Swiss-Prot record:
Processed by proteases extracted from C.pipiens larval gut; unlike its partner BinA, it does not form a stable digestion product. Its main location: other. GO terms for molecular function: toxin activity. In protein gels runs as a 63 kDa protein. Gene3D superfamilies: 2.80.10.50. Residues 199-448 are annotated as: Probable pore-forming domain. One of its GO terms (biological process) is sporulation resulting in formation of a cellular spore. Component of a binary toxin active against Culex and some Aedes mosquito larvae. This subunit alone has no toxic larvicidal activity. This subunit is responsible for localized binding to specific regions of the host larval gut. Binary toxin internalization into host gut cells requires both proteins. It comes from Lysinibacillus sphaericus (Bacillus sphaericus). Forms a heterodimer with BinA. Upon toxin crystal solubilization with NaOH at pH 12, only the 63-kDa (binB) and 43-kDa (binA) proteins were detected. Interacts with mosquito protein Cpm1 which acts as its host receptor. This is Binary larvicide subunit BinB. Disulfide bonds join C67-C161.
Length: 448
């Protein structure tokens, strides 16, 4: 096994050391750190009236007289309770999502009333108006805990119109005025959790160690194909269903049965080529690494994230609010570039300086991301092959006195200039050693 002896990376028996290599760690991700309100759908009620709320689905809300609420195209009465989950963002705010339809609270400003904005139900987009700060408090008379929701840097507070009557309660946000709010306003903005449903949350797998590069056992042994390679789990994260596109489930079913999806990050040795090279002969071999544009676009569509040219993670609007939690769980860094990783095709010339024919098999490190539902079903996976980490095994290896030599290296195509580097040649491949491309070993490609 390729075990790590310190924080610098791979141990000597696995090859050359290098930094920033994913180490074996225990899962420290979302389902171990989430607050209860992010693991349950609570029936949100006003503290004083104990009534539920109504929610609009209209795209054109308008205000009603002086009430801190608005008229709605669809209303729910107290006999139709709504259950809400609060997805925790990296900055401590929440996305408030409805179990019934999978949509989220959205503060929709209206030009008719600048003081009161309606809360409507919309698809999650990652916009600021869908993010709420929850602040806990307590009643100085009863001692009962309650909480309030703020938007726009605490300049607006979620308000529960008609909180003291038995009719349907409508939600809005009210502008916070100076000094102290009237008692009625306090009553309108105080909420408590009532009954709940548990969210559907998958378990995180244990991490594992990456095995050594597979060795061929005969001249006829062509090595291990990618589909048969042993995977090592290096990290995993829970993805709120609101950022995931599942082609087989609508928003409502995702919210009820897959409140969170599991994204696993695995590594394995991906075979680039396998060939018998005759004694004292040179062969030309084409190597294809990186990730195709089709695969990147699929990852963007389904996860709203993608892989950067430095193999770090990049995020779009839906996923960006959760990026710190996701990268921490996956044990992957944020990308230091905005350039998207592309496909890389190289032509290599290898020379066998031995007095016998040798079977050589070359592998590169593959970084695989797999999206799973709560029941373990695989939705999709994405693989990026890292050209910077590669090694060769051979058969026979005991009689060999001279290692394989890379005599010429040419880039045929790389889809971005960020990874447009070549090896200094000649380069010696020792059997089973992981060759690491560092800045000192690379010659920058000259831009034409």
């Amino acid at each position: 096994m390729c075990d790590s002896k310190d924080n610098s990376g791979v141990s000597e028996k696995c090859g050359k050391k290098f930094t920033n290599y994913p180490l074996n760690t225990t899962p420290t991700s979302l389902n171990y750190n989430l607050p209860e309100i992010s693991k349950k759908f609570y029936n949100l009620k006003n503290k004083y009236s104990r009534n539920g709320y109504g929610l609009s689905k209209t795209e054109f809300p308008s205000s009603i007289e002086n009430c801190p609420s608005n008229e709605y195209s669809i209303m729910y009465d107290n006999k139709d309770p709504r259950f809400l989950i609060r997805f925790l963002l990296d900055d401590g705010r929440y996305i408030i999502a409805d179990r019934d339809d999978g949509e989220v609270f959205d503060e929709a400003p209206t030009y008719l009333d600048n003081n009161n904005h309606p809360i409507i139900s919309r698809h999650y987009t990652g916009e600021e108006r869908q993010k709420f700060e929850q602040v806990g408090s307590g009643d100085y008379i009863t001692g009962e805990q309650f909480f309030q929701f703020y938007t726009q840097n605490k300049t607006r507070v979620l308000s529960n119109c008609r909180a003291l009557d038995s009719r349907t309660i409508l939600l809005s946000t009210a502008k916070i005025f100076p000094i102290y709010p009237p008692a009625s306003e306090t009553q309108l903005t105080a909420f408590v959790n009532s009954s709940f449903y548990a969210a559907a949350i998958p378990q995180l797998p244990q991490t594992s160690l990456l095995e050594n590069i597979p060795e061929p056992t005969s001249l006829d042994d062509s090595g291990v194909l990618p589909k048969d390679a042993v995977r090592a789990v290096k990290g995993s994260a829970l993805l709120p269903c609101i950022i995931v596109h599942d082609p087989n489930l609508n928003n409502s079913d995702k919210m009820k049965f897959n409140t969170y999806y599991l994204l696993e990050y695995k590594e394995y040795w991906h075979q680039l080529w396998s060939q018998i090279i005759p004694a004292h002969q040179t062969v030309k071999i084409q190597e294809r690494t990186g990730i195709s544009e089709v695969v990147q676009n699929s990852m963007i569509e389904d996860l709203n994230m993608y892989i950067g040219a430095d193999f770090g993670m990049l995020f779009y609007f839906r996923s960006s609010g959760f990026k710190e939690q996701i990268t921490r769980g996956l044990n992957r860094p944020l990308s230091q570039t905005t350039t998207q990783l592309g496909e890389r095709v190289e032509e290599m010339e290898y020379y066998n300086s031995n007095d016998l024919d040798v079977r050589y098999v070359k592998y590169a490190l593959a970084r695989e991301f797999t999206l799973k539902r709560v029941n373990g079903e695989i939705v999709k996976n994405w693989v990026a092959v890292d050209y910077r980490l590669a090694g060769i095994q051979s058969y026979p290896n005991a009689p060999i006195t001279n290692p394989l030599t890379l005599t010429k290296h040419t880039i045929i195509r790389c889809e971005n200039s960020y990874d447009g580097h070549i090896f200094k040649t000649p380069l010696i491949f020792k059997n089973g050693e992981v060759i690491v491309k560092t800045n000192e070993e690379l010659i920058p490609k000259i831009n034409q």
